[in-house]
Amino acid sequence: MNIRKKTRKIYIGNIAIGGDAPIIVQSMTNTDTRDIEATLKQINQLHAVGCEIVRLAVPDANAAKALKAIHDASPLPLIADIHFDYRLALTALESGIEGLRINPGNIGERKKVVTVVDAAKAHKASIRIGVNSGSVEKHLIDKFGGPVPEAMVESALNHIKILEDEKFYEIKVSIKSSSVLDTIAAYRMLSKSCDYPLHLGVTEAGSLIRGTVKSSVGLGILLSEGIGDTLRISLTEDPVEEVPVAWEILRALGLRRRGPEIIACPSCGRAEIDLIRLTKDVEACLVNEKTPLKIAVMGCVVNGPGEAKEADIGIAGGRDKGIIFAKGKVIRSVHGQDKLLNVFMEEVNKVIAEYNTTQ
């Protein structure tokens, strides 16, 4: 792991981004923003699973008008995703939205950009410049022969300069491609070229499995190199599925922890319990738990306690029985497979309570 690059600190609402702030988990609603009730429901669902900032699409004036009601009831800071019509950005800022995601170059003539920047200053809002490989300007595609990393970086730097020329520095930048390798290359170049906080993502990553793999590889490499201040896992799924993936990437790299880490063996012919079901049941019981414990679910009593000796608590199954252990030592035996989950969760809850009283 490389030391994380110290970028310029900005704020989205009360959330610090960059500098010495932790890496922040974001997502984006996929509801019709004009449907206030549905959008707030999804924002609350995202909040419940650990999302810290939410972006909303603002495609038209009616969506922009809905933002105030959404903002006023939202438990999280919000970013309005704006393209082409600068008036939507102004309405969003007047609604209290904490941040914008725009490309200054597609807002229109310079005076429109200046109007948006002045409004962002007045409302103490930040602006994310979001460059995607599919939206690189034609002259840069012609110059570089395609939407290659060099073209994306030059596009981002050009957009940054537009804001800097207006003395605006509350900037965050993203530079995404559907290609993992291009995404990595682009962020590496951009990180060397500016000190603004970077929002990481692989765009159009795909469905749950494919998108998780692509994002984990791409973002994991960048984060391990000290690059990145916020991240979003883009999945063709309910956005609630994105957030746990982001947290697991951060956990795997030792950057942040949220909730229990559940480790489980892959199962083999020695397993004498339904290990897959037991693991899923334990995960379901702890889905909303925030205590950062390590919990092991192992398939057999031969190797289970030893293999999971670093776990705070764990269970190893045998023929119609299970052994519960803590830090590798047996603390309780359970007879009857139908009792394993309930008894194990009793012990887990004791450990959680003990942990929380010592913090």
Swiss-Prot record:
GO terms for molecular function: 4 iron, 4 sulfur cluster binding; 4-hydroxy-3-methylbut-2-en-1-yl diphosphate synthase activity (ferredoxin); 4-hydroxy-3-methylbut-2-enyl-diphosphate synthase activity (flavodoxin); iron ion binding. Pathway: Isoprenoid biosynthesis; isopentenyl diphosphate biosynthesis via DXP pathway; isopentenyl diphosphate from 1-deoxy-D-xylulose 5-phosphate: step 5/6. It comes from the Bacteria. One of its GO terms (biological process) is terpenoid biosynthetic process. Belongs to the IspG family. PANTHER family: 4-HYDROXY-3-METHYLBUT-2-EN-1-YL DIPHOSPHATE SYNTHASE (PTHR30454), 4-HYDROXY-3-METHYLBUT-2-EN-1-YL DIPHOSPHATE SYNTHASE (FERREDOXIN), CHLOROPLASTIC (PTHR30454:SF0). This is 4-hydroxy-3-methylbut-2-en-1-yl diphosphate synthase (flavodoxin). The gene is ispG.
